[in-house]
């Protein structure tokens, strides 16, 4: 966990304090819906909306949270450079949280995992079996890997992603 956190920091991400996390919660979701004012904005702009001072060069705002319940604003799709980071005590707990996020966020879309796919094939297969998603990305950025092309040549490039029967769609591939 700490190694990943340090790598995020090294790459220009900003970890929010507890107070800053709470302030950003009040900006992410407004009246039960994603706040349109954060969509596509920079991390610096979003932080400013929450009254948080971060360097202009900040790439991503990260809140360390525990809950994956819908009541946790960080557990929603945010369409912006805002991430939740979860610390778990076991692989099983990580998979359970991932399953819940997929369930609440929408079956069929995309899941991703960073793993040594040569030495941890059993773990990878378990992940693939448990995630009810049409795209399971391995060791690639999920936001760009899911749309194909630059980070993933195995998927047709598209900004329209089918979610298959899990998501109530007629197609499961990139359209």
Located regions from the model:
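Helix N-cap motif at beta-to-alpha junctions
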Residues: 1-2, 90, 118-119
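Short amphipathic alpha-helical coupling segments at ligand-binding clamshell hinges
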Residues: 3-7, 97
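Alpha-helix capping/termination and helix-coil
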Residues: 50, 54, 86-106
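Short, flexible turn/loop "capping" segments at secondary-structure junctions
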Residues: 72-79, 103-106
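Terminal or standalone catalytic/regulatory effector modules within metabolic enzymes
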Residues: 101, 105-108, 119-123
């Amino acid at each position: 966990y700490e190694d990943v956190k340090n790598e995020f920091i090294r790459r220009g991400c900003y970890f929010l304090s507890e107070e800053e996390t709470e302030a950003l919660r009040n900006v992410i979701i407004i009246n039960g819906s994603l706040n349109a004012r954060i969509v596509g904005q920079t991390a610096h702009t979003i932080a400013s909306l929450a009254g948080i001072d971060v360097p202009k060069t900040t790439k991503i705002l990260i809140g360390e949270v525990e809950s994956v319940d819908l009541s946790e604003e960080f557990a929603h799709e945010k369409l912006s450079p805002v991430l939740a980071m979860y610390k778990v005590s076991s692989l099983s707990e990580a998979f359970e949280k991932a399953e819940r996020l997929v369930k609440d966020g929408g079956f069929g879309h995309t899941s991703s995992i960073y793993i040594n796919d040569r030495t941890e094939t059993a773990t990878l297969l378990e992940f693939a079996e448990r995630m009810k998603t049409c795209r399971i990305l391995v060791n690639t950025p999920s936001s760009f890997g899911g749309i194909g092309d630059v980070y993933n040549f195995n998927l047709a490039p598209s900004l329209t992603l089918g979610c298959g029967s899990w998501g109530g769609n007629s197609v499961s591939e990139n359209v």
